[in-house]
From Swiss-Prot:
Active site: H89
Function: Catalyzes the formation of 6,7-dimethyl-8-ribityllumazine by condensation of 5-amino-6-(D-ribitylamino)uracil with 3,4-dihydroxy-2-butanone 4-phosphate. This is the penultimate step in the biosynthesis of riboflavin.
Taxonomic source organism: Helicobacter pylori (strain HPAG1)
Chain sites annotated for binding 5-amino-6-(D-ribitylamino)uracil: F23, A57, Y58, E59, A81, I82, I83, F114
EC number(s) reported in the record: 2.5.1.78
GN (gene name): ribH
The protein, known as: 6,7-dimethyl-8-ribityllumazine synthase
Positions with a binding annotation for (2S)-2-hydroxy-3-oxobutyl phosphate: G86, T87, R128
């Protein structure tokens, strides 16, 4: 039996985008910082890292599709924060953002990591953006790095 898995180390020549929504920027800025830190710590070249900002989580799938279609990137780390409010808006935005991100990843067969928080309140979001529950932006970039490595291994 053979076990195949990715490594948590970049070769240093991977071009990566961090796609982040600006809405709830107090949270998404921290997620972005965590992702950038992870990229650098694991051998990424800052000159090969682009930060792409969109207004909100609903816009993430469209711009992810454009980034993958461009052929410029080896992978994309998608970050956002959708916080439940008093209306069904949360359900619609989180469902469509999630479906759209997964759809673009499969359409282009490219590594994409999902770091979009979906929380019931601001406290939960803060916990996941660098306090009690770690930084989910850092974790999303870690996932992307492993995916990049695994895809390279499977390519042969």
């Amino acid at each position: 039996m053979q076990i195949i898995e990715g490594k948590l180390q970049l070769q240093g020549n991977e071009r990566v985008a961090i796609l982040t929504s600006r809405f709830n920027h107090i949270i998404t800025d921290r997620l972005k910082e965590g992702a950038m830190d992870c990229f650098k710590r694991h051998g990424g070249d800052e000159d090969l890292l682009d930060i792409v900002l969109v207004p909100g989580a609903y816009e993430l799938p469209l711009i992810l599709d454009k980034l993958l279609e461009s052929g410029k990137y080896d992978g994309v780390c998608v970050l956002g924060a959708i916080i439940r409010g008093g209306t069904p808006h949360f359900d619609y935005v989180s469902a469509e953002a999630t479906k759209g991100i997964a759809s673009a990843m499969l359409k282009y067969s490219m590594p994409v990591s999902f770091g979009v928080l979906t929380t019931d309140n601001i406290e939960q979001a803060i916990e996941r953006a660098g306090s009690k529950a770690g930084n989910k932006g850092f974790e999303a970039m870690s996932t992307l790095i492993e995916l990049l490595s695994l895809c390279q291994t499977l390519k042969g």
